[in-house]
């Protein structure tokens, strides 16, 4: 609890400080610090039914909902060379992307799809030849639908073997050029969103959470989370035994982490905040770094929380070379005085017994303290492991309506100013955390270009580049944030006050 109160003090120091006005430049970051941007396969590639690719969980869920889909998306499958040129223009060190399991091994196991294999080899070679480091995510909510149909996907222990075999193919075929691997993207959100809330693939849940067609919110998130941890450990072990000596890469695991702070300075809210941290972060980081689940979860969830055998605990502990942090905003946490009933089928939030209240910067205000809170918490609670910020950004609305044809907002680029302010503030916040001892080694903007967003379709965009999704050629155009990021990565000092924003707009006014 003392740590939470200390983090609350950080919040008080920075929450009302306004925009980050410190002057800093790229040279202030440690040698080897990586700046990049990211995408994911289903959101960027398109070509959903081309060259042997078969449906994944994403395809199934998105086609069942009226919010668009990734059938074409950004058409990165055909336009990757043009996109790499844009990365060079933006001065990126690295590009984070995911491999589509259903493109590489369409049936989940068995023969490798040679056309899919060649696509990823071509993409990686294009990146490397232009001096851009590939950072690969193996799993972004998208195992082949065939495995879900056959045995229930991550609800079944069989998934561990199939995922390890798939990862082995990736290491064997791409590992000579890939040094940073993330096994699972946002494991906590995949487990909660897909098996408690039903909002993300595979869309499973039960009352009292929601009323999906199938699922059990009281137990499935924990089964899935457990199997994800065992699969990660299996993949990490495979890499270290077969490939690490030759390839020299690192294996990480990513989580969505909010900047949690107590709503008040009361002990009850501080305790609730620690409980929320245990459920959201400790659920995965404690096994990865210490070998077992938080005591808070074991006491509350009881027999519904799977148990690691002694051998499994040893395998999971220390299997993570770095922690991938996906962070967007903060949330205040309030203790629930009248505890909900845990009888029947309680969902994830009933177990946690907290109220997140209103996210303090849900509208993505410039509050870099939220990032600092996250990094300080990881440093203090988990032994300061190496960290990469794998996603962090602010969205802009890019379409006036969803539909066909869609009408793009003509003022989108000019409306990117709040996003520039956000990036400036958060990148500066990372620097403050590094100076305070955090072992943070990289920052990836989400996303390199506007993508198909699972919860927002094509209505919102996180990209440095806008994409005209009503254009068959999917024309890309830089936003003001792309120019700012490029200037920063070229070594220009970052300073944003009202005059600095005017100068930035004036500098690139002819480009819009």
UniProtKB/Swiss-Prot annotation:
Query: Cell membrane as a keyword?
Result: no
E.C. number(s) listed in UniProt: 3.2.1.21
Q: Which UniProt keywords apply?
A: Disulfide bond, Glycoprotein, Glycosidase, Hydrolase, Signal
The record places the active site at 186, 391
Q: Which domain of life is it from?
A: Eukaryota
Kindly give the PROSITE patterns that the UniProt entry links to this protein.
Answer: GLYCOSYL_HYDROL_F1_2 (PS00653)
Similarity section? Belongs to the glycosyl hydrolase 1 family.
Name under which the protein is recorded: Beta-glucosidase 4
Q: From the UniProt record, report the name of the gene that encodes this protein.
A: BGLU4
């Amino acid at each position: 609890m003392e740590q939470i109160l200390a983090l609350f003090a950080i919040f008080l120091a920075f929450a009302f400080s306004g925009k980050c006005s410190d002057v800093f430049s790229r040279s202030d970051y440690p040698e080897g610090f990586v700046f990049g941007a990211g995408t994911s396969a289903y959101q960027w590639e398109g070509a959903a039914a081309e060259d042997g690719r078969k449906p994944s969980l994403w395809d199934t869920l998105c086609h069942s909902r009226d919010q668009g889909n990734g059938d074409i998306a950004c058409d990165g499958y055909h336009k990757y060379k043009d996109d790499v040129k844009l990365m060079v223009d933006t001065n990126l060190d690295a590009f984070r992307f995911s491999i589509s399991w259903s493109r590489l091994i369409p049936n989940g196991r068995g023969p490798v799809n040679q056309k899919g294999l060649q696509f990823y080899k071509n993409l990686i070679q294009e990146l490397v030849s232009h001096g851009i480091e590939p950072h690969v995510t193996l799993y972004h909510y998208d195992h082949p639908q065939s495995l879900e149909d056959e045995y229930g996907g991550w609800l079944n222990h069989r998934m561990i073997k199939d995922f390890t075999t798939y990862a082995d193919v990736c290491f064997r075929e791409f590992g000579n050029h890939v040094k940073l691997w993330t096994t699972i993207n946002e494991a906590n959100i995949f487990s909660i969103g897909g098996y408690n809330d039903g909002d993300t693939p595979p869309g499973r849940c039960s009352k009292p959470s929601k009323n999906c067609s199938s699922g059990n919110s009281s137990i499935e998130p924990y089964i899935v989370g457990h199997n994800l941890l065992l699969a990660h450990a299996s993949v990490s072990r495979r890499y270290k035994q077969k490939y690490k000596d030759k390839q020299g890469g690192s294996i990480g695991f990513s989580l969505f982490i909010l900047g949690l702070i107590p709503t008040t300075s009361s002990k009850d809210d501080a305790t609730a905040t620690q409980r929320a941290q245990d459920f959201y972060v400790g659920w995965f980081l404690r096994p990865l770094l210490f070998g077992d689940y938080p005591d808070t979860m074991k006491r509350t969830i009881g027999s519904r929380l799977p148990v690691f055998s002694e051998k499994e605990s040893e395998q999971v502990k220390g299997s993570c070379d770095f922690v991938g942090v996906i962070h967007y905003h903060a949330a205040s946490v309030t203790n629930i005085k009248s505890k909900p009933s845990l009888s029947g089928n309680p969902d994830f939030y009933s177990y946690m017994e907290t109220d997140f209240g209103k996210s303090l910067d849900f509208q993505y205000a410039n509050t870099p303290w939220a990032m600092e809170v996250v990094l300080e918490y990881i440093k203090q609670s988990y032994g300061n492991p190496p960290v990469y910020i794998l996603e962090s950004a602010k969205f802009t609305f890019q379409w006036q309506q969803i539909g066909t044809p869609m009408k793009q907002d003509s003022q989108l680029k000019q409306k990117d100013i709040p996003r520039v302010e956000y990036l400036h503030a958060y990148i500066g916040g990372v620097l403050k955390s590094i100076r305070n001892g955090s072992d943070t080694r990289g920052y990836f903007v989400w996303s390199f270009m506007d993508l198909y967003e699972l919860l927002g379709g094509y209505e919102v965009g996180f990209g440095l580049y806008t994409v005209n999704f009503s254009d068959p050629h999917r024309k890309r155009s830089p936003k003001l944030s792309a120019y700012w990021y490029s200037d920063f990565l070229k070594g220009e000092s970052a300073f944003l006050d009202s005059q600095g924003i005017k100068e930035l707009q004036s500098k690139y006014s002819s480009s819009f």
